[in-house]
């Protein structure tokens, strides 16, 4: 697996990337990137080109990072889904590239105050908890984002859920439950990481 070159990579470091085939036969590329530029970046999009063993392009896909913007030094997971199942067996390699726009810094005023996780008897994996808005402004469209890892610390899943309530006034509390519903991968989960995002704030 290789990572493409280009101007956009001057703004990011790819911390990891991994390919997974889901229970329906679709290829997912999971990964994490860090903003190494000197400014906040928004609308960060991961682009992938897919190749067969002969180096021929068999398709492309893209996906927006889970965080709506990345402060300087901040890390976000991403997911790209290749929807052409007819090419799954031909897949051999891929390249990654990233595009972004200049954004505005988000304070880290969303705090995870409780957290627990568990698998269920049906093969799903749940991550739930509570969030506090420690900022002075209302946080809108609050989202909990969970990245899942296997025994080898490879990223094997990414899922998110809107908090309840999704708009949090100053110093209020919301709850969330994120579900990992790919049963093939959920049985391999060894660890996870969690981020909270909103239009105004991010988590610590």
Language-model regions, residue ranges each:
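Short aromatic-acidic-glycine turn motif
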Residues: 50-59, 148-158
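Intrinsically disordered, low-complexity Pro/Gly/Ser/Thr-rich segments with frequent PxxP/GP/PP motifs
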Residues: 58-86, 157-185
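Short, solvent-exposed loop/turn segments enriched in Ser/Thr/Gly
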Residues: 24-30, 121-128
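Hydrophobic beta-strand segments
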Residues: 45-48, 63, 143-146, 161
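Asparagine-centered strand-capping/turn motif at beta-strand->loop junctions
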Residues: 33-38, 131-135
């Amino acid at each position: 697996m290789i990572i493409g070159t280009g101007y956009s990579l001057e703004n990011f470091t790819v911390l990891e990337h991994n390919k997974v085939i889901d229970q329906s036969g679709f290829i997912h590329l999971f990964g994490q990137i860090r903003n190494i530029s000197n400014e906040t970046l928004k609308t960060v999009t991961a682009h992938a080109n897919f190749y067969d063993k002969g180096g021929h392009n068999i398709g492309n896909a893209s996906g927006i990072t889970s965080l709506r913007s990345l402060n300087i030094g901040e890390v976000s997971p991403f997911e790209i889904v290749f929807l052409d199942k007819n090419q799954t067996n031909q897949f051999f390699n891929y390249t990654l590239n990233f595009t972004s726009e200049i954004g505005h810094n988000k304070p880290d005023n969303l705090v995870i105050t409780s957290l627990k996780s568990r698998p269920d008897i049906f093969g799903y994996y749940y991550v739930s908890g509570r969030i506090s808005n420690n900022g002075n402004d209302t946080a809108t469209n609050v989202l909990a984002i969970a990245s899942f890892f296997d025994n080898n610390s490879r990223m094997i899943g990414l899922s998110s859920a809107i908090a309840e309530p999704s708009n949090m006034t100053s110093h209020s509390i919301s709850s969330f439950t994120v579900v990992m519903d790919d049963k093939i991968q959920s049985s391999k989960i060894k660890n996870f990481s969690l981020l909270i995002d909103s239009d105004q704030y991010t988590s610590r």
